[in-house]
């Protein structure tokens, strides 16, 4: 078992990134990515692939307490720096502290600012009473959280972002503990470091939207549920924490809650834990959970799932036809059935500048590239888990990740970075396991994957430029 991030893999990743960037920039020279985002991407890629190998070795000798202290300190420092810099950057280019195209962010802020001056009775009636939205509760969680922050601190925009930096840093510790329990202490530390240095997790701390809090709840749900399933003794707090966490996911995005319940049921069904081998107990747990789903999910849950499912036709068909009409015939082949098999590698990195609305994707291109490159280790992890007959131990993370990403990839949002982001906590765990199980035979395949990654980035650049009729 490899217990550190190998330097030679990091060097390959960096070289592959610059080869991809140079090829895309030269071929689509007129639409080359803005220089500021090239610099930002270079910083993020260097930070991730230089410091992860170094710290995975240096921090392996630390006590758990010191490791957690170092991990949180690094994570929160990086995130706070980004929060401050992005705040003033957005003020400079937009005149307000919101990113380009921040309709959702401004909506959340405006609603929370307005409701923060109202009574709690009015607030709960607004969200849960007769006047509540017909779309259900799937977008209630973040507005409630944000207006609570505003009630305490006032409608100061930077305060929630500072809290996001702390929440995201805490998530790094959760990912470490989950991975350490599932695999090995030193392997778990690699997962924590990668989480701390993951560019998109840093960038989202500067956004006024729900993704950071949502990812924290996803990671906490997986960690607490894994603890529950592996523990031989149960107490009310352990059980209630898992239930409350999966319940909270329904308040952020119904599909997340469904994926969480599905993952729990799958884990119980295939668990090798001695305490879960009592057939009657297993049937009782599954039966009770199914009953809860039927009772609680008869309305809004199925409505949102159906909406995502229906969009796999209406959304993606409309997008493909529009793009094809503008000269990119490849768009006709970007169906859900094509995108779904690539779900562990999505989204592709945007290394071209086609319009000002896309600058957010340019800013996040480094994080998307890391997902493209590290997908190799997710595939290796799945292969090794099956080969070694250890897949039952990892059903919780795997079932959640693929249940969620599967629905998204078939719904017309197959390359939407924001919609794919909730799969990242599970993928971080899978990357770590695949990396730890790398063998000489599988390592040889990495050079072919690097070529494939270059083709991914070039192909996506062609798709972005062609879909807008720019050549």
Feature map (PLM): residue ranges:
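Transmembrane-helix signature of polytopic, membrane-embedded enzymes
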Residues: 158, 175-197, 395
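Short acidic/glycine- and proline-prone juxtamembrane loop motifs at membrane-interface regions
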Residues: 206-214
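Transmembrane alpha-helix segments characteristic
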Residues: 16-23, 76-79, 241-244, 389-409
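Hydrophobic, aromatic-rich transmembrane alpha-helices
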Residues: 53-54, 344-391
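Membrane-interface alpha helices of multi-pass inner-membrane proteins
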Residues: 202-203, 237-260
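Transmembrane-helix motifs of polytopic, lipid-linked glycan transferases
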Residues: 57, 162-182, 376-381
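Membrane-interface helix-loop-helix junctions at transmembrane boundaries of multi-pass membrane enzymes
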Residues: 176, 181, 232-237, 358, ...
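Membrane-interfacial entry segments at the cytosolic side of transmembrane helices
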Residues: 63-70, 234-240, 272-289, 439-451
